[in-house]
Regions:
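Conserved beta-strand segments of alpha/beta enzyme cores
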Residues: 31, 66, 123-125
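Short, hinge-like loop/turn segments at secondary-structure boundaries
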Residues: 49-53, 85-86, 125-128
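Short, well-structured N-terminal submotif of metal-dependent ribonuclease cores
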Residues: 1-34, 46-59
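Alpha-helix capping/helix-boundary segments
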Residues: 10-11, 38, 74, 96-97, ...
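A general alpha-helix detector
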Residues: 41-42, 60
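Active-site neighborhoods of divalent-metal-dependent phosphate/nucleic-acid chemistry enzymes
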Residues: 66-109
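Acidic, PIN/NYN-like endoribonuclease modules and their adjacent C-terminal/linker elements
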Residues: 3, 41, 98-128
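Short secondary-structure capping/turn micro-motifs that flank functional sites
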Residues: 62, 94, 116-118
Length: 128
């Protein structure tokens, strides 16, 4: 299996044992990558829920997902995506995730229902 990209929401589903986590099988998880931007998003959401920042960072890393740096090419792709995703209200974090997937030619896993309407050139799997 080739690389797959996890959105922050997919990682949070794993960490918090939320509905849909069962769709992220071991086979899928062992090939997962995440943008550094989205890893920061995971940590931020955990801190907002009351976690200590250091513990939140360790928890985010505990998923054993490979972290990819946010490159200038991905930044350009994320900027370009505003034209086709603005009507869906996607954040910079969302577009960063999609930019990584586009750069890698990899499918994306997310919990965001709105994403199933996106046509960005890569498969999008909504896990719940």
């Amino acid at each position: 299996m080739n690389e797959v990209v996890f959105d922050a929401s997919a990682i949070l589903a794993l960490l918090q044992h939320e509905r849909g986590e069962e769709r992220l099988t071991v086979e899928i998880r062992k090939n997962a990558v995440v943008s550094a931007v989205n890893l920061a998003e995971v940590q931020s959401k955990l801190v907002k829920k009351g976690h200590d920042p250091e513990e939140a960072w360790v928890d985010a890393l505990s998923t054993m997902i490979e972290v990819e740096p946010f490159t200038s090419d991905q930044a350009r792709i994320a900027g370009d995506l505003i034209a086709t995703t603005e009507k869906y209200g996607l954040s910079l974090g969302d577009r960063s995730c999609l930019a990584l997937a586009i750069a890698l030619g990899a499918p994306v896993y997310t919990t965001e229902q709105l994403w199933k309407n996106l046509k960005v050139g890569v498969p999008i799997h909504v896990i719940r």
